Amino acid sequence: MTSALLEDLRWRGLIYQETHPEEMEALLNKESVSVYCGTDPTADSLHIGHLLPFMTLKRFQAHGHRPVVLIGGATGMIGDPSGRTDERTLQTLAQVQHNVDGISKQMEQLFDFGTENGAIRVDNKDWLGKIDLLTFLRDYGKHVGVNYLLNKDSIASRLETGISFTEFTYTILQAIDFGHLNKTLNVKLQIGGSDQWGNITSGMELMRRMYGEVEAYGMTVPLVVKSDGKKFGKSEGGAVWLDRTKTTPYEFYQFWINTPDSDVIKFLKYFTFLSKEEIDALETSVENEPHLRLAQKRLAEEVTKYVHDESALEEAVNITDALFKGDLKALTADQLRTSFKDVPQAKVTTTNLVELLIEAGISPSKRQAREDITNGAISINGEKVQDVAYEIVATDKIEDEFTIIRRGKKKYFMIIH
């Protein structure tokens, strides 16, 4: 019998590599399984590059399995060489703990805790931190061959550029994690990104050598690559964070709504819990009425709601609608700052509109500035102004601090007073 979960994962293209597919499928059909996915606290927030493996873990929870979320308070102090060409900078204990705390809070939004198959959050510092050097070398290191490690892509790719003994031992630490969780929480499956295959299989091999035959499986999700070949997960402003103080819900929503037609269906499969029927209907919409961008809107709505909440989604949609209509008065000062933080800014001293347009570099000359005004091309805070003698007044200064000028349909400028 085919597992409904695995059938869904395969349709979505979420299984990149897996160990013993038939045995794993039989296990998932037979019982509720504890499944784990981990991350190292390299920052105090996850970013969207972390989403795919954790959302895949969430799909296991939706099908009755128990997710175990590991935050690497110990491994985060060492540094994973996977996917790296250089050595990581070691973090202080205080910085790692700060990052662990930040990511732990985000997990509460991503998973259901306290239910019958509620998620369990663990920190590998709780067990790795208790292993002394001699125990590590005798009880674990004895079971790991150096040649075995040298054949791992994460290590082999670093041999020419150099790798420290610290990072060389990383895969052993993650292998210990899998064995510990298997023994203490009956974890039988580990999920990770495609770069984690070597670490996952190392855990299975260590368990086999230490305990004999153990029921343990591994699965990786694909590396997310955009249709233009560029790396997924970054906007022009850098990483897209799950922390709303680093990336606002509006910016987060905008990242997803700007997904090109060539990627949107794949992303709907990867990053939403919509059914096959809904996604098929949206695919038809992309083919027949792409100008409506229904698929992009649904993608942005679903991911924003999942990562943040309904109220954050509502605010993001309201800002988007207000900007589209040019109704800036519908937005608060904070919303305007967020919306226009990337537009050109200019500090001006004059209050005369014509002089302001020149001083701020909005219009190239007095003649052009006057033409722009009389032709209705200039708006102040969303209101069209066609008086060439217009003077900026106190009510034009939002919180007595800034004014938003628009020239034409899409060119915005922030004037600082």
UniProtKB/Swiss-Prot annotation:
In the UniProt record, does the keyword Ribonucleoprotein occur? no
Report the top EC class in one word. ligase
Q: Which Gene3D superfamilies match?
A: HUPs, RNA-binding S4 domain, Tyrosyl-Transfer RNA Synthetase
Answer yes or no on keyword Cell membrane. Answer: no
Segments forming a coiled coil: none
Q: What is its EC number?
A: 6.1.1.1
Q: Which residues form the S4 RNA-binding domain?
A: 351-417
Question: Keywords for this entry?
Answer: Aminoacyl-tRNA synthetase, ATP-binding, Cytoplasm, Ligase, Nucleotide-binding, Protein biosynthesis, RNA-binding
Q: Biological process GO annotation list? A: tyrosyl-tRNA aminoacylation
Q: Which InterPro entries match?
A: aa-tRNA-synth_I_CS, aa-tRNA-synth_Ic, Rossmann-like_a/b/a_fold, S4_RNA-bd, S4_RNA-bd_sf, SYY-like_C, Tyr-tRNA-ligase, Tyr-tRNA-ligase_bac-type
A single Pfam family it belongs to is: SYY_C-terminal
**Where in this protein would one find the motif 'KMSKS' region, according to its record?**
231-235
Which ranges belong to the motif 'HIGH' region?
41-50
User: Where's it found, cell-wise?
Assistant: Cytoplasm
Binding, L-tyrosine: Y36, Y170, Q174
The Gene Ontology CC terms held by the record are: cytosol
**Binding of ATP, residues:** K234
> Catalysed reaction per UniProt?
tRNA(Tyr) + L-tyrosine + ATP = L-tyrosyl-tRNA(Tyr) + AMP + diphosphate + H(+)
Any single GO molecular-function term of the entry would be: RNA binding
Q: NCBIfam families, alphabetically?
A: tyrS
The task this protein performs is described as: Catalyzes the attachment of tyrosine to tRNA(Tyr) in a two-step reaction: tyrosine is first activated by ATP to form Tyr-AMP and then transferred to the acceptor end of tRNA(Tyr).
Q: Which family, according to the similarity comment? A: Belongs to the class-I aminoacyl-tRNA synthetase family. TyrS type 1 subfamily.
Q: How does it assemble?
A: Homodimer.
What name is this protein filed under?
Tyrosine--tRNA ligase
